[in-house]
């Protein structure tokens, strides 16, 4: 079975489930705190994805946000709803993310945003696509031309935005790391900075950006993989400038 075709069809199927419940969720549970939440729809969506992978790829392992942390040379990485807060509040910027990793390298990734009817995907060596159309990162070579994005991180975000708003056209926070990263690949944003994040949030976006001609590193500027903790996704042309600003912020707040 073709893994990419399997992944796209599966996430679109799960997307139909999410749209039934989008903005209509009554039972919201806290995980690590009031900003880190989960719903029964997260769990149901994850079960759907896991069941299909177990059925068609029974010898392969799974890492999924809601409590599955297997390891292995052939690994599927799942985020059933990336942007649960947006999903619960009826905001459209949420996504389902699925990546396949072989021997530590991401081989394919799919990010599906059902409320936006957008599917972004890539497979190693085959390019990146948005609803079937080939995509490339932007060609903006000056920060003054750029729209960047980041997540909501205590200590880091405010200081990062303060610095970048003076240098860029604008900074946006979408609330879905997977979608944020994929949008770098689509050229919708020029860079995305994420801080202390998990593999299921960014694994699919990582290969989408790379296959779209972009660059993905950690905060030191070294090439990142799905299991790095801090990421800078960019079109490559303004990457060094973003690394510089990020490290100014990290130094100021005294953390890595």
Swiss-Prot record:
Pfam families: Inositol_P (PF00459). This is Fructose-1,6-bisphosphatase/inositol-1-monophosphatase. Coiled coil: none annotated. Phosphatase with broad specificity; it can dephosphorylate fructose 1,6-bisphosphate, both D and L isomers of inositol-1-phosphate (I-1-P) but displaying a 20-fold higher rate of hydrolysis of D-I-1-P than of the L isomer, 2'-AMP, pNPP, inositol-2-phosphate, beta-glycerol phosphate, and alpha-D-glucose-1-phosphate. Cannot hydrolyze glucose-6-phosphate, fructose-6-phosphate, 5'-AMP and NAD(+). May be involved in the biosynthesis of a unique osmolyte, di-myo-inositol 1,1-phosphate. Homotetramer. It comes from the Bacteria. GO terms for molecular function: fructose 1,6-bisphosphate 1-phosphatase activity; inositol monophosphate 1-phosphatase activity; metal ion binding. It comes from Thermotoga maritima (strain ATCC 43589 / DSM 3109 / JCM 10099 / NBRC 100826 / MSB8). Its EC number is 3.1.3.11, 3.1.3.25. Gene3D superfamilies: 3.40.190.80, Fructose-1,6-Bisphosphatase, subunit A, domain 1. Keywords: Carbohydrate metabolism, Hydrolase, Magnesium, Metal-binding. It is an enzyme of class 3 (hydrolase). InterPro entries: Inositol_monoP_metal-BS, Inositol_monophosphatase-like, Inositol_monophosphatase_CS. In contrast to mammalian I-1-P phosphatases, is only weakly inhibited by Li(+), since 50% inhibitory concentration for Li(+) is about 100 mM, and the Li(+) concentration required to totally abolish I-1-Pase activity is 1 M. It catalyses: beta-D-fructose 1,6-bisphosphate + H2O = beta-D-fructose 6-phosphate + phosphate; a myo-inositol phosphate + H2O = myo-inositol + phosphate. Thermostable. No loss of IMPase activity after incubation at 85 degrees Celsius for 30 minutes. Heating at 100 degrees Celsius for 10 minutes results in a loss of about 20 to 25% of the activity, and 30 minutes at this temperature inactivate about 70% of the activity. GO terms for biological process: inositol metabolic process; phosphatidylinositol phosphate biosynthetic process; signal transduction. Signal peptide: none annotated.
